[in-house]
Regions:
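Conserved alpha-helical substructure of the radical SAM core
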Residues: 1-120, 131-142, 146-147, 153-154, ...
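A C-terminal junction/extension of Radical SAM enzymes
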Residues: 1-12, 155-159, 168-181, 185-244
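Conserved beta-strand segments of the P-loop GTPase G domain that flank and frequently precede/overlap
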Residues: 124, 161
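A glycine-centered beta->alpha junction motif in the catalytic cores
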Residues: 125-129
Length: 244
């Protein structure tokens, strides 16, 4: 008779863990933990995940992994392309969440050459135009949109992740139309993070221009995600994770 611990280990190998691969990020999103005074020691103690250690993690988990930084944007890991190369062709689902700004055409061409049909690129774009930069401080909307289209044209699954704020909630219907036109999946986020610019935990240099949305678009505890449009590539990506 198998032990409970054995069953637990078997189950754990089938989850997709989240990897915070480094401490690096070029942006200053006001609600991010990086912009809190309490996170600064953690950031200073952090380091870049080595390729050797990442290989061990990736080999252990059978279904894939997620790159969604809590104190980092994964694409700013200095060897992130090599991490993508490790994942390439292994028939595991890989999710990459990024702001997606600040990298060259050549960098993106190589990044998108890996994991076609296996990778899902989630771009944080909170609106249909430059208003997205009010939260993604330091990003360039036009550059990010270009990278999303570039990935789509190279066969990648592109997910448009849209946090709902007061200044973009009236544009949701138009965002859905655009997502369908561009063949992007659209994921709406009801945030559970605060809207107090005088929060004592905020760093003094935070540029807080956020406006709270209607109460129906906020959450008290855990954030809420709603798929407003699912592309055919997203549905194919889901099927990749189903093991016979």
């Amino acid at each position: 008779m198998p032990r409970i611990t054995d069953e637990y280990v078997i189950h754990q190998r089938k989850v997709r863990p989240n990897i915070d691969a480094s401490h690096r990020c070029a942006f200053r999103c006001p609600q991010c933990i990086r912009q809190k005074t309490i996170s600064q020691d953690q950031i200073r103690r952090s380091f870049d995940l080595s390729e050797e250690n990442f290989q061990k993690i990736f080999d252990y988990y059978t279904e894939g992994i997620t790159f969604c930084g809590q104190i980092s944007d994964p694409i700013y890991h200095p060897n992130f392309l090599n991490l993508l190369k490790i994942c390439n062709g292994q028939r595991k689902r890989v999710r990459i969440a990024t702001v997606g700004s600040g990298k060259s055409d050549a960098w993106w061409d190589e990044a998108y050459s890996y994991g076609v049909g296996e990778n899902a690129w989630y771009f944080g774009v909170d609106g249909i135009d430059e208003k997205s930069e009010l939260y993604r401080v330091g990003s360039n909307f036009q550059d990010v949109w270009k990278r999303m289209r570039q990935g789509r044209d190279l066969g990648q699954l592109i997910v448009w992740q849209y946090i709902i704020f007061g200044y973009n909630e009236h544009e949701i219907d138009r965002a859905i139309e655009i997502a369908k036109e561009e063949d992007f999946s659209l994921l709406l986020i009801n945030t559970n993070r605060g809207f107090n610019p005088n929060n004592r935990l905020l760093r003094s240099n935070v540029d807080f221009q956020l406006t709270s949305p209607d109460k129906k678009h906020t959450q008290e505890r855990v954030k809420k995600e709603l798929w407003a449009h699912k592309s055919s590539r997203l549905l194919e990506w889901y099927r990749l994770g189903r093991r016979d």
